[in-house]
A protein has these predicted regions:
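A conserved regulatory-domain signal marking ACT and ACT-like small-molecule sensing domains
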Residues: 15, 328, 333-464
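NAD(P)-binding Rossmann-fold cofactor-contacting core
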Residues: 31-58
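Catalytic, metal-anchored helix/loop core of enzyme active sites in primary metabolism
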Residues: 161-165, 173-176, 180, 192, ...
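Rossmann-fold NAD(P)-binding glycine/threonine-rich loop
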Residues: 88-105, 113-153
Length: 464
């Protein structure tokens, strides 16, 4: 009788027992007799968390838990370390980086779901992986359950990416979707997202765009070889968007508003930004609803002659949550378990240094601008002349009849006390211009005595 070769056992250590860490434990412990245990040979050998006794699996498997991270990082039977600590403050990031570096020094490969650590310390971490000869995998950092990194590596192996863009934060997409559907003010939509578990108690990293920024840093690294740092990307949050903006968006070609992360090649530079954007209804991204994420890819050759809104294919799915993220993490772990786990290089499709980051002020897009001014003659003309002097061309001007509820919502968002008749909202769409010109024009306009609320402005994606 022929002997059956059993897979060698691969020891796994887990840092973190929060939402993602617990979902990883659920999958591994429920599958001990299944594919992960028998066919791949995964064996979870140690779990670090600060307070083990309160955790779901502690009662059944107390010996696996520890409150000392070094018991995972220095464990002789651990081959792969999963870092799923989930940061609450940037002050934690140096420590999480040190955990990853220690794992490499001890000859262990690392799988992480922590985008913030890689966005800030990616270059240092990759250098350490190379020195140690170990692997680093981070599929879960970008798309949660969507295989963004794997798709980039496989699909663009024979051609360079031209653009990678899409919706990478489910919290923001849920909030904006609710504002559009129900007409709720931003504050109410955010509260609902928190009640349903889509937004954290402190939602700042989601709504101000920093979560999307970290993901975009990794996308730009893999797709374009850019080694960026947080703070170098132009970033706008969604906090100033109000339901009235969706009414105007609907009138402007049936558009909607989505928070987009964009990396788009412009010659030898890459235009990179995170911002809410006006998206035309015929664009696929306009139909992506709720907490769903979607990422579009366009190749340099196949995109020739097409508009920047178009893409070769789209990945859609749940971008966050314990279950989808655990699937992505364990997919990386399984891939490492099947391989020799030797360092295979930085996974950039374009060698680092070939392309540069486009200067922030040179970002070149059309814009949507919502003004709220005092109701008196000559204001629209004055604003138009200011844009004209700076070389910014107005495409259209929109003024809707506003119900009092919309006016009250605008007043509350800006904490104003002006009477209803004193406020006149209207929208301008601007032809393609640079961020430098846009800022110069708005700096000139915003301090004039007729401005009631600071202008709300953001790109029109795919506009001419």
């Amino acid at each position: 009788m022929a002997s059956v070769n059993k897979p060698r056992t691969v020891g796994v250590g887990l840092l973190g027992s929060g939402v993602v860490g617990e979902a990883i434990q659920d999958t591994l412990f429920h599958d001990l007799s299944g594919a992960l245990g028998k066919e791949i040979g995964l064996d979870l050998r140690k779990i670090y968390t600060r307070n083990p006794k309160g955790k779901k699996w502690y009662r059944k498997r107390p010996a696996l838990f520890t409150s000392r991270a070094e018991e995972v990082l220095d464990h002789p039977g651990v081959d792969i370390v999963i870092e799923a600590l989930g940061f609450q403050s940037v002050r934690q990031l140096p420590q999480f980086r040190d955990y990853i570096l220690r794992a490499f020094r001890n000859g262990k490969s690392v799988v992480t779901s922590d985008k913030a650590v890689l966005a800030r310390y990616g270059k240092e971490i990759w250098s350490a992986a190379k020195r140690s000869g170990q692997q680093l995998r981070f599929e879960a950092c970008v798309g949660g359950g969507i295989p963004v990194i794997r798709s980039l590596s496989e699909s663009f192996a024979i051609e360079e990416p031209e653009a990678i863009f899409g919706i990478v934060n489910g919290t923001c997409n849920y909030i904006l979707s609710q504002m559009e559907k129900s007409g709720k003010p931003y504050a109410e939509a955010l509260k609902e997202a928190q009640e349903k578990g889509y937004a954290e108690t402190n939602p700042a990293s989601d709504v101000n765009g920093s979560d999307a920024e970290a993901k975009l840093i990794l996308i730009s690294w893999v797709g374009f070889g850019l080694q960026l740092q947080p703070g170098r990307i132009w970033r706008k949050g969604i906090e100033d968007i109000q339901a009235v903006d969706f009414r105007y968006a609907g009138r402007i070609g049936g558009s909607t508003i989505k928070q987009l992360a964009v990396a788009q090649r412009k010659g030898q530079a890459v235009q990179v930004f995170v911002s809410p954007a006006l998206v035309a209804r015929d664009n696929f991204l306009a139909s992506v609803d709720g907490a769903t994420n979607a990422i579009c890819f366009a190749g340099k050759n196949s995109s020739a002659g097409r508009g920047e809104r178009d893409c070769d294919y789209v990945l859609v799915g749940p971008g966050a949550g314990g279950g989808p993220t655990a699937v992505a993490v364990l997919g990386d772990v399984c891939e490492l378990a099947r391989s020799e786990r030797k360092f295979s290089g930085v996974p950039s499709l374009i060698p680092p240094g070939m392309l540069k980051l486009q200067a922030e002020n040179d970002i070149d897009v059309p814009f949507y601008v919502r003004f709220v001014v005092k109701d008196r003659a000559g204001i629209v003309g004055d604003i138009g002349r200011t844009f004209g002097r700076i070389g910014v061309n107005i495409s259209e001007i929109w003024q809707l009849r506003h119900v009092e509820e919309e006016i009250q919502s605008l007043k509350q968002s800006a904490k104003l006390k002006q009477k209803y008749q004193d406020m006149l909202p209207f929208v301008m769409t601007l032809e393609r211009t640079t961020l430098r010109q846009m800022r110069k024009a708005l700096d000139s306009i915003r301090n004039r005595d007729y401005i009631v609320i600071d202008p709300v402005w953001f790109p029109i994606w795919g506009g001419k």
